[in-house]
Amino acid sequence: MKTLKHALIVYKVGNPQAEKTAHDIQHWFYNKNVTSNLFSSDIPESQLKQSLVHTQVAIILGGDGTFLSISRNLIEKQIPVLGINFGQVGFLVEIHPENWPQMLEQLYSHKLVLQKKIVLSWSIIRHNQVIKNGFAINDVVVGRGALARVLAVDVSINKHHIGVIRSDGILVSTPLGTSGYTISAHGPLVHPDVQALTLTSVSTLFRSTPPLVLPLSTTITLTPSPHAIEPFLTVDGQEGFVLKPNDSVGIQGIKSGLLIYTTANYSYLQHLQKKGLLSSTDFNL
């Protein structure tokens, strides 16, 4: 990154501590001759995107939900993100609130590490036309409607027909996202440095298709049964779209979609241990 001149600051709406820290950060930037735009996380998407013209880095203060909702809007312009944790879990957000001054000093002096994370590009296809598309940082799910007992989804990988899977839904995830819904659905936990996508069926009626780890270059097409009752596409557990009969969802991976600043000593496996996703019992061998 060139000399930092323009920053974006977004704090979790309704969190007074995050709001106060956001204003402190804006003052810190002012003393460094860095201009900054400051918003709460409920800013309209169109207004947020208008503010990105000169943005070189985004500081997001909140939990994983705030991080996901704001970061999705930064993917297209490849704006790096630094997350400060004001949430309950904070799996995606590394920095503790008390450490923000040291982290910004490291950011300003180019001492943080910029990691490139895989994201998903998804599109809803209707009558051979893309009618909606976007990005996902964690995962996309084609799931059953509220009134449906089970959903039949036709699955194709690189135009090769895999078959029809009957389940509560089909979950496609990035490596970063496998630590969330994917492992809860008994899918694989994949290190984020692995160039791959995963496909997991949720509560499968007949366990005929195991969780799959697929090359990043894979194109996945999911087509719900035309008789399905309001099948639903969910993006990062935050955005939802009702699918009509004969709609298909196309999903691909993007190698360097999300740029995240981390500390030089960051360890993914250690992070998993801290969050309780990797544990062991001490005993004498």
UniProtKB/Swiss-Prot annotation:
Its main location: cytoplasm. It catalyses: NAD(+) + ATP = ADP + NADP(+) + H(+). It is an enzyme of class 2 (transferase). One of its GO terms (biological process) is NADP biosynthetic process. The keyword Repeat does not apply. The active site is at 64 (proton acceptor). It comes from the Bacteria. GO terms for cellular component: cytoplasm. NAD(+) binds at residues 64-65, 138-139, 149, 166, 168, 176, 179-184, 238. Pfam families: NAD_kinase, NAD_kinase_C. The keyword NADP applies. InterPro entries: ATP-NAD_kinase_N, ATP-NAD_kinase_PpnK-typ_C, NAD/diacylglycerol_kinase_sf, NADK. GO terms for molecular function: ATP binding; metal ion binding; NAD binding; NAD+ kinase activity. It is found in: Cytoplasm. Its EC number is 2.7.1.23. Keywords: ATP-binding, Cytoplasm, Kinase, NAD, NADP, Nucleotide-binding, Transferase. Its cofactor is a divalent metal cation. SUPFAM superfamilies: NAD kinase/diacylglycerol kinase-like (SSF111331). Belongs to the NAD kinase family. Involved in the regulation of the intracellular balance of NAD and NADP, and is a key enzyme in the biosynthesis of NADP. Catalyzes specifically the phosphorylation on 2'-hydroxyl of the adenosine moiety of NAD to yield NADP. PANTHER family: NAD KINASE. This is NAD kinase. It comes from Lawsonia intracellularis (strain PHE/MN1-00).
